[in-house]
């Protein structure tokens, strides 16, 4: 069966693994998921990610990040633009997650960017997810 929304699947796997205090989470690889993982690593929400060969296709493995007393680095994840209802934001009206404490991930003509990066470049796009 084909997957309708691979980004939502990635975020759900990440949310579930984070809630269960797993150290790693594995999912099918795609370039879009790898770019989302790049943003999560750059913003400090995950420790690292790697691409692995599997028997069929490739796998993306995310290493989750926890504090010294196993505090979660990700408090919440929400998918915003869905296949049934796309959500777009102009460069003048970019979302701010929790007053700037979280990150909005946008798909723009310049690739995947955070809300802060998109504001600096002056581009808008599809709002994929919020992470805080």
UniProtKB/Swiss-Prot annotation:
<dbReference type="InterPro" id="IPR000630">
    <property type="entry name" value="Ribosomal_uS8"/>
</dbReference>
<dbReference type="GO" id="GO:0005840">
    <property type="term" value="C:ribosome"/>
</dbReference>
<dbReference type="GO" id="GO:0019843">
    <property type="term" value="F:rRNA binding"/>
</dbReference>
<keyword id="KW-0689">Ribosomal protein</keyword>
<keyword id="KW-0687">Ribonucleoprotein</keyword>
<keyword id="KW-0694">RNA-binding</keyword>
<dbReference type="GO" id="GO:0003735">
    <property type="term" value="F:structural constituent of ribosome"/>
</dbReference>
<comment type="function">
    <text>One of the primary rRNA binding proteins, it binds directly to 16S rRNA central domain where it helps coordinate assembly of the platform of the 30S subunit.</text>
</comment>
<comment type="subunit">
    <text>Part of the 30S ribosomal subunit. Contacts proteins S5 and S12.</text>
</comment>
<keyword id="KW-0699">rRNA-binding</keyword>
<dbReference type="Pfam" id="PF00410">
    <property type="entry name" value="Ribosomal_S8"/>
</dbReference>
<dbReference type="InterPro" id="IPR035987">
    <property type="entry name" value="Ribosomal_uS8_sf"/>
</dbReference>
<protein>
    <recommendedName>
        <fullName>Small ribosomal subunit protein uS8</fullName>
    </recommendedName>
</protein>
<dbReference type="GO" id="GO:0006412">
    <property type="term" value="P:translation"/>
</dbReference>
<comment type="similarity">
    <text>Belongs to the universal ribosomal protein uS8 family.</text>
</comment>
<dbReference type="GO" id="GO:1990904">
    <property type="term" value="C:ribonucleoprotein complex"/>
</dbReference>
